[in-house]
Amino acid sequence: MRKNENIENIEGKIYQFDLKEKVTGENSKNPGTPYIAGTVEVAVDAEASNIVPVHYTYVAPTYSSGKSNNTYTALKQIITSGKTVVTDGYDMATCVKLNPSYSVNDWYPQGQETVQTTPRNEGGFVNIVTPDTLRPEGDIGRHKFSVDVIIFEVTEITPDEGDSYVQIKGITFDFRNAALPITMVARNAAAAKYFLDLEASKKNPVYTKVWGKIVNTYIKSEKVTESAFGEATVDTIVRRNREYLITGANPVPYEFDTEGTITAAELSKVLQDREVHLAEVKKNSEEYNASKNAKSASPAAQAATASVPQGGFSF
């Protein structure tokens, strides 16, 4: 199985951040190791109309080789002296260039059997820069993604408001070649037609490279509650709309089921591995909830071991 592309580039001013310095516990592989975890939100334009969050799960001061980790140093600097759009204004906010990858966060809400999977921009290098080194506003390079993807579903969506668009579902891969579900959209008419014409399905997956821009906007609306007396109550509701908007694709898709790309057997294996991962997530969630409620842990979720039949991939 070839190495698959999964890269992002995020540039702009720090909108706000939630970074914390922590120490690994006694049951970890390296107990007592300091690390930083949390999120940096980047405003890619002066109006802060597109705010892209990047998550950091574990950033230690050094690599396993003992070499200093510059990403840790940069995140530490943000914690101690970083300025944000929220507290200091756009002009004074710290400028950054981030190089995360597309990832997902899998979790099971307590008491529910269905996994929740949300997209996440994860990890990568962090560089604190000067304003003159940023790409111009409007440049797609400020919020770009590029991924190799196996497409298995393309659906035309007609919303109640706004123009029709096409939704593209598939899987991409992390640096370990683990499968990551991804949902993208195409709003350009030519792009929409291109993806619909692929006739991609679970029995006829299409393996290709796509790229585009990460659009993360916040939509505000008001809910008015009338009162029998006195003034009505007005609540502001903020809804986040996140899109991976495709702006380009390879002219010719990769060949599928070949040794030089990915074979049907390899695809079946990575999909099976994801089922095992989700079973482990469920097991950990159940054990955590049980310990939190001071009850005995429920039986561990069984990992999926059945093979995925060729030509009928279980996405």
List the predicted regions and their residue ranges.
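OB-fold and OB-like single-stranded nucleic-acid-recognition modules
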Residues: 1-315
